[in-house]
From Swiss-Prot:
This is 3-isopropylmalate dehydratase large subunit. One of its GO terms (biological process) is L-leucine biosynthetic process. Binds 1 [4Fe-4S] cluster per subunit. Its EC number is 4.2.1.33. Pfam families: Aconitase. It comes from Vibrio parahaemolyticus serotype O3:K6 (strain RIMD 2210633). Keywords: 4Fe-4S, Amino-acid biosynthesis, Branched-chain amino acid biosynthesis, Iron, Iron-sulfur, Leucine biosynthesis, Lyase, Metal-binding. Its cofactor is [4Fe-4S] cluster.
Length: 471
């Protein structure tokens, strides 16, 4: 029987497989940030160990950096300590660090791919839930805890049980204006936020292969939000074109040889998955979450669901609780509610394509007077590219705030956060209670939908907006 893409990558990395024991996998790349690494480095220090392979370990500062200044003190005492500690640890152990003032600084899951650190067929780990992002390249990438961070630093390996496999196929082409974010939110709406638990997911189908690498990263980024361990997309010409010429990518003949291997990284025709989920791309509309997990999502033109519409008693109770927390009334439209803040950014949607999509909506328009709207590029490289294209000017003229790179309002670990009961249209990946600030209300949307909400002051259907034909 043939193998799935996941099985091929997993099997190629088994370093030790003893009977009755969880296999030990070799790890090709280890990405590190300031929040989940301090205790791991302390553990190495206590035991007198070194970082086993510094050339495969890359660090940056992202979670609690300020997006208004490069001052390390700006996000408070804990943030300053974490960033200073990362700096000291990387210097002591010889690890490459892209710190606050480095031209490659950025969100770890934006920085890795754009520098060619992320390559097809690799195993990639990071002390961060959304490491699955890198699976867009056909790599096996997943988040790990701090004790596992220490283990990988010390050994370049990790115990990892084989997961079940799930195929999620999005058949056909999406309608105009439908983005990768809409696709993945529609997927989670179908599977629920726990539907992928215990699985590694492979996303496929015409709607997936039509996506750019930025779009594919958005989809894989949210694999964790349907409960999956990781999400992968088979590499193809789009992947190879993106990788070519990047800082850490193979060059010349080495690149050609790598591509020959990467072309083998696809699921065999006779491979079997443990579960299969299918969606028709043509049915996908612009998506907005209404509740407090990413599976509580509807199309923008659908009414807010009533708890009674759920047959499962747990889902019904969850819906009741979510509506109360979110301050929403069943049967109403999401467009009936004003938004207070808009956030375009995060490891889900802060790449150049996302900036461009938001700028198309912003051009020649103005942010509503009651809305604060933040545009936060995912890295210094994205910021520089956007500014070279004049996108920052478009945003600033429209009344958006053009910020410095960082995780920003995705999570309440820096100064960008919601106040109690503030409603936010956000391009991030989690709408949990308190995720963006205590009692904050988060609605997950695409960059274009977020920008449109900033201008209208409430949610609108992006398909009903008209754009300058010159764009």
């Amino acid at each position: 029987m043939g193998k799935t893409l996941y099985e091929k990558v997993y099997d190629a990395h088994v370093a030790v497989a003893a009977e009755g024991e969880t296999p030990i996998l070799y790890i090709d790349r280890h990405l590190v940030h300031e929040v989940t690494s301090p205790q791991a480095f302390d553990g190495l220090r206590e035991k007198g160990r070194k970082v086993r392979q510094v050339s495969k370990t890359f660090a940056t500062m992202d979670h609690n950096v300020s997006t208004t200044t490069k001052d390390i003190n700006a996000s408070g005492e804990m943030a300053r300590i974490q960033m200073e500690t990362l700096s000291k640890n990387c210097e002591e152990f010889g690890v490459t660090l892209y710190d606050l003032n480095h031209k490659y600084q950025g969100i770890v899951h934006v920085m890795g791919p754009e520098l060619g650190i992320t390559l097809p067929g690799m195993t990639i780990v990071c002390g961060d839930s959304h490491t699955a992002t890198h699976g867009a390249f056909g790599s096996l990438a997943f988040g790990i805890g701090t004790s596992e961070v220490e283990h990988v630093l010390a050994t370049q390996t990790l115990k990892q049980a084989r997961a079940k496999t799930m195929k999620i196929e999005v058949k056909g082409k999406v309608a105009p204006g439908i983005t990768a974010k809409d696709i993945v939110l529609a997927i989670i709406g179908k599977t629920t936020a726990a539907g992928g638990t215990g699985y590694v997911v492979e996303f496929c189908g015409e709607a997936i292969t039509d996506l750019s690498m930025e779009g594919r990263m958005t989809v894989c980024n949210m694999a964790i939000e349907l409960g999956a361990k990781a999400g992968l997309i088979a590499p193809d010409e789009t992947t190879f074109e993106y990788i070519k010429g990047r800082k850490f990518s193979p060059q010349g003949a080495d690149f050609d040889a790598a591509v020959e291997y990467w072309k083998t990284l696809k699921t065999d025709a006779d491979a079997e998955f443990d579960a299969v989920v299918t969606l028709n791309a043509a049915d996908i509309k612009p998506q907005v979450t209404w509740g407090t997990n990413p599976g509580q999502v509807i199309a923008v033109d659908q009414p807010i669901p009533a708890p009674e519409s759920f047959t499962d008693p747990i889902e019904k109770a969850s819906a009741e609780k979510a509506l109360a927390y979110m301050g929403l009334e069943a049967g109403k439209s999401l467009s009936d509610y004003q938004v207070n803040k808009v956030f375009v950014g995060s490891c889900t949607n802060s790449r150049i394509e996302d900036m461009r999509a938001a700028a198309v909506v912003a051009k020649g328009r103005k942010v509503a007077s009651h809305v604060q709207a933040l545009i936060v590029p995912g890295s210094e490289q994205v910021k520089a590219q956007a500014e070279a294209e004049g996108l920052d000017v478009i945003f600033k003229e429209a009344g958006f705030e053009w910020r410095l790179p960082g995780c920003s309002m995705c999570l309440a670990m820096n100064n960008d956060r919601l106040g109690p009961h503030e409603r936010c249209a956000s391009t991030s990946n989690r709408n949990f209670e308190g995720r963006q600030g205590r009692d904050g209300r988060t609605h997950l949307v695409s960059p274009a939908m977020a920008a449109a909400a900033a201008i209208a002051g409430h949610f609108v259907d992006i398909r009903e907006l008209t754009f300058d034909k010159q764009d």
